[in-house]
């Protein structure tokens, strides 16, 4: 089964090297990283704010950024993640890491700070 559509002209609104779909944590950092490396980037987000499901649905924890190393909870994911966390911390929107279910290290944040 197939559908045939007539040919049509579609306007282009720009030319980009990288198009990132979704303005969640991964999308934000992917777009920023590509732009810093000289790419022309378009970040497409369906909501009127960034943050992905964290801000849209109230999932307000980053999981996987920290690990238990010799009894200490330490951040193990760095790079541009540090910049994101620093910006949220400057807005007083970041809490200390904590345990969920006794084994998952998570870092809670203020959803409003992620939208900025």
Task: Report the location of each language-model feature.
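Short gly/ser/thr-rich secondary-structure transition/capping motifs
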Residues: 1-5
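Conserved N-terminal/central alpha/beta ligand/cofactor-binding core
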Residues: 7, 13-15, 33, 39-40, ...
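N-terminal Rossmann-like FAD-binding beta1-loop-alpha1 element of flavoenzymes
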Residues: 18-42
């Amino acid at each position: 089964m197939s559908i045939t559509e007539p040919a049509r002209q579609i306007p282009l609104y720009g030319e980009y090297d990288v198009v990132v779909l979704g303005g969640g944590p991964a999308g934000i950092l992917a777009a920023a990283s590509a732009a810093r490396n000289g790419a022309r980037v378009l970040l497409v987000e369906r909501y009127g704010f960034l943050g992905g499901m964290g801000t849209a649905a109230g999932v307000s924890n980053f999981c996987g950024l920290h690990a238990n190393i010799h009894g200490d909870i330490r951040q193990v994911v760095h790079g541009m993640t540090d910049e994101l966390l620093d910006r949220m911390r400057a807005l007083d929107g970041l809490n200390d890491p904590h345990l969920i279910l006794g084994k998952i290290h998570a870092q809670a944040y203020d959803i409003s700070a992620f939208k900025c």
